[in-house]
Design a protein with these regions (language model features):
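Short acidic, low-complexity intrinsically disordered linear motifs used
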Residues: 1-18
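Short acidic DE-rich linear segments
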Residues: 4, 97-105
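Generic low-complexity, intrinsically disordered sequence content enriched
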Residues: 8-10, 22, 69, 78
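Short, charged/polar N-terminal "headpieces" of proteins
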Residues: 18-29
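Acidic, low-complexity, intrinsically disordered interaction modules
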Residues: 28-89
C-alpha cells in the first residue's frame, strides 16, 4: 500500500525526528550552539549546530546532515534545507545562510 503525503507533512515528520534527538542547546551572546547531548557538551565533544545572530548564518555538522539524508532518502541539499527550517523554529532570529562541513575531510 502506498501513501501520498504533502511536502509539509513530510517536513513535519522530519521536524518530529529532530525534536526527538533532544539536542543540548545553549544560548550565548552571538546565537545558539547545539550538541548531540549534555554529556557530549560536558566532555568537549563536537558541536552539532551553531547559529550565529551577527552573521545570520548557521553551521550544521555533516554527521547530522548525512543522518537525516540517509534516514529520509533525501539529497544532501534537501536535508540541509529541512534541517535549516527546523532550526528556525528553535531560535529567536532569522538565518540567511546554512552550510555544512560535508566533504571537508
Amino acid at each position: 500500500m502506498k501513501y501520498l503525503i504533502t511536502e509539509s507533512q513530510f517536513d513535519n515528520i522530519i521536524f518530529k525526528y529532530l525534536d526527538m534527538q533532544n539536542f543540548y542547546k545553549m544560548r550565548y551572546d552571538k546565537g545558539y550552539v547545539f550538541w548531540e547531548s549534555k554529556e557530549v557538551w560536558e566532555s568537549g565533544g563536537n558541536i552539532t549546530i551553531t547559529a550565529n545572530r551577527e552573521r545570520s548564518e548557521c553551521f550544521v555538522n555533516s554527521d547530522l546532515l548525512v543522518e537525516v539524508a540517509s534516514i529520509f532518502s533525501l539529497e544532501l541539499n534537501d536535508s540541509l534545507n529541512v534541517i535549516g527550517a527546523w532550526i528556525k523554529t528553535q531560535i529567536d532570529f532569522d538565518i540567511a545562510e546554512f552550510f555544512s562541513d560535508y566533504g571537508a575531510d
